[in-house]
Design a protein with these regions (language model features):
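RNA pseudouridine synthases
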Residues: 1-319
Length: 319
């Protein structure tokens, strides 16, 4: 429940909003306001909980009353997002499923899941612009920027907690489709190789197989074979950064047009074959999970975009 005066807004925290940090809560209330400004008003004591000053890490409880001061920014949120209006509108066309608890979309390749690291626009920012009335929208999991496919978003904090629990307990099944170099051997049904993440000076993340890394496993199944490539279904058992991309490379079958782990000769073959492919061929094809509100087991599939379909058709015709 909210009450407002011309200068101050008082928000009563519901059970669904409880448990989150005050700084994260303010980001949902003050859309378009820079994080630096949010921390400044917290530091200066302009934000109060139950009439007391609080620190950014304070966790809200049901029944808390949050005093939010008026915040002026140089640009209104609508103006700030205007260069991306076409991308925002496009997100409406790729929503696969939505109810009061969750939203599932077919993320386009080339779009980051969230802004940051020099990116001003991501899926979550776009969804918040598309659904300005939504009090809560948070990513349940992530996809690499160049990976397309099923992306799950929680619309309630209780839904986010339930779905994160499923991820931790391996109760969520993800299936990806990847086009890899050469003939994947049918007997290779699983790759188990520990992965170690390195951060370069540029800030770029590179992952490699290392005994010092975290245990990682991906299961594989051949879907279709072509003259010099294989379409494989990849089901990660663990959820490490770049896991499928590094495991396929480790198995000797890197994914097409992977800007970090690819085989350039394989990419050249695909170009010369007239596939028209110019992006990472990794697509999150399906996601199976238990609905956080109803308990129903759901399996949502995301179709490949036309570019990936054309590529596969070219390879079929060339056999």
């Amino acid at each position: 429940m909210k009450t407002e005066t011309p200068s101050v807004k008082i928000v009563a925290i519901t059970a669904d909003e409880a448990g989150q940090r005050i700084d994260n809560f303010l980001r949902t209330q003050l859309k378009g306001v820079p994080k630096s400004m949010i921390y400044r008003i917290l530091r200066k004591g302009e934000v109060r909980v139950n009439k007391k000053r609080i620190k950014p890490e304070y966790k809200l409880e049901a029944g808390d009353e949050v005093r939010i001061p008026p915040v002026r920014v140089a640009e209104r949120e609508e103006e700030a997002v205007s260069p991306h209006l076409q991308k925002v509108a496009a997100l409406a066309d790729v929503i696969l499923y939505e109810d009061d608890h969750i939203l599932v979309l077919n993320k386009p390749s080339g779009t980051a899941v969230h802004g940051g690291s020099g990116l001003s626009f991501g899926v979550i920012e776009g969804l918040r612009a598309l659904r300005p009335e939504a009090r809560f929208l948070e990513l349940v999991h992530r996809l690499d920027r160049d990976t397309s496919g099923v992306l799950l978003v929680a619309k309630k904090r209780s839904a986010l907690r339930s779905l994160h629990e499923q991820l931790r307990e391996k109760g969520m099944q993800k299936d990806y489709l990847a086009l890899v170099r050469g003939q994947w051997q049918s007997h290779v049904k699983s790759v188990q190789a520990p992965l170690l993440k390195n951060i370069l000076q540029s800030g770029e993340r590179i992952v490699r197989v290392s005994q010092e890394g975290k245990p990682s496993e991906t299961r594989f199944k051949v879907e279709e074979r072509y003259a010099f490539a294989t379409l494989v279904r990849c089901s990660p058992v663990t959820g490490r950064t770049h896991q499928i991309r590094v495991h396929t490379q480790y198995a000797g079958h890197p994914i097409a047009f992977d800007d970090r782990y690819a085989d350039r000769e394989f990419d050249r073959q695909l170009t010369e074959a007239g596939t028209g492919l110019n992006r990472l061929f990794l697509h999150a094809a399906a996601l199976k999970f238990t609905h956080p509100g109803t308990g129903e087991v759901m399996r949502i599939e995301a179709p490949m975009d036309e570019g990936l379909k054309r590529c596969l058709q070219k390879l079929r015709n060339a056999r």
